[in-house]
C-alpha cells in the first residue's frame, strides 16, 4: 500500500502534544508525509453560549489548553492553510459558494501535499463546558446547507468539517473514529455520553459517505481496561494496540476499494 500523505485531527489521544496515536497510525501505514493537526483538550463542537458561537477563527495551534479556540474547525482551517500555496489566500468552495479566511488571520503555507488519508478522532472532551453539553441533534442539522452549519453541536461541526475536507480533498479517504471508552468520574466521558457521541459520529459518516472506525467497541479499550491502563489516555501498551487497530481498519478498508 502506498500512502503518500496522511493527515489527522483530534484531541489529546491523537495529538503529538499528549498520546500521539495519530502519528503512530501514520507510521504503521508507512505514510511518506504526515500532518498531525490534533490538539490536547480539543472539542469537536465550537464553543458557544446558547446559539451564539464564541470560538474565534484562528490558525494558531493552541498549546494543549481548554480554550474556545481549541476546536476541530480550527484544525480543519490549519489543514487548509497547509494545503494552500505559500502566500495565497486560503479559499475553498462548497455548493458553489466560495469561502475564505481573511489574510490578516493567515495565508497559505504550502507545506502539505493533498492527503490520501484523513483520520479524525475527536469527541471525548465534548461536554466539558456546561454550555456545551453533548446532544444528538443530527436529525435537526443533517439536511441543512453548508452555510447554515453553526458548528455549535457535534453533528453540525462534523458535517462542516467533512464537507469542507471533501471539497478540498475530493479523492481522500476520510475516516471518522468513535471515542475510546474511559474510566473517569467526569460525566461527559461516561458510558452513556460515549454512546451518544458514537451514534452522532456514525450518523455523520453514513450521511457524508465517509468511513467510520468504531474504536468505542472495536479497539478493545473498554471501561475495564481503561481503569488500569490510563483511564482516559491509554498507557504505552494500549497506545500501541490502538494504533495497530486503527491502522488495520484503514488498511482493510483501502484494500477493499
Predicted feature residues:
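A generic secondary-structure signal
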Residues: 82, 160-168, 245, 249
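Conserved beta-strand segments of alpha/beta enzyme cores
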Residues: 33-35, 173, 209-212
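Catalytic His-Asp segment of secreted/periplasmic serine-dependent ester chemistry enzymes
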Residues: 51-52, 179-257
Amino acid at each position: 500500500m502506498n500512502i503518500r500523505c496522511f493527515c489527522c485531527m483530534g484531541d489529546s489521544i491523537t495529538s503529538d502534544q499528549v498520546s500521539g496515536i495519530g502519528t503512530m497510525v501514520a507510521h504503521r501505514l508507512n505514510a511518506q508525509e504526515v500532518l498531525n493537526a490534533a490538539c490536547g483538550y480539543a472539542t469537536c463542537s465550537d464553543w458557544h453560549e446558547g446559539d451564539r458561537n464564541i470560538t474565534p477563527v484562528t490558525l494558531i495551534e493552541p498549546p494543549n489548553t481548554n480554550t474556545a479556540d481549541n476546536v476541530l474547525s480550527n484544525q480543519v482551517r490549519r489543514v487548509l492553510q497547509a494545503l494552500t500555496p505559500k502566500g495565497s489566500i486560503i479559499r475553498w468552495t462548497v455548493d458553489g459558494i466560495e469561502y475564505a479566511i481573511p489574510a490578516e488571520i493567515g495565508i497559505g503555507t504550502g507545506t502539505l501535499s493533498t492527503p490520501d488519508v484523513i483520520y479524525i478522532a475527536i469527541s471525548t472532551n465534548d461536554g466539558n463546558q456546561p454550555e456545551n453539553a453533548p446532544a444528538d441533534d443530527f436529525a435537526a442539522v443533517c439536511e441543512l446547507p453548508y452555510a447554515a452549519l453553526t458548528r455549535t453541536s457535534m453533528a453540525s461541526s462534523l458535517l462542516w468539517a467533512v464537507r469542507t475536507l471533501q471539497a478540498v480533498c475530493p479523492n481522500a479517504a476520510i475516516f471518522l473514529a468513535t471515542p475510546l471508552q474511559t474510566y473517569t468520574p467526569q460525566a461527559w466521558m461516561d458510558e452513556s455520553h460515549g454512546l451518544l457521541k458514537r451514534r452522532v459520529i456514525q450518523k455523520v459518516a453514513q450521511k457524508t459517505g465517509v468511513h467510520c472506525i468504531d474504536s468505542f467497541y472495536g479497539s478493545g479499550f473498554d471501561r475495564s481496561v481503561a481503569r488500569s491502563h490510563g483511564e482516559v489516555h491509554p498507557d504505552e501498551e494500549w497506545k500501541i494496540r490502538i494504533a495497530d487497530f486503527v491502522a488495520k481498519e484503514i488498511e482493510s478498508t483501502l484494500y477493499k476499494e
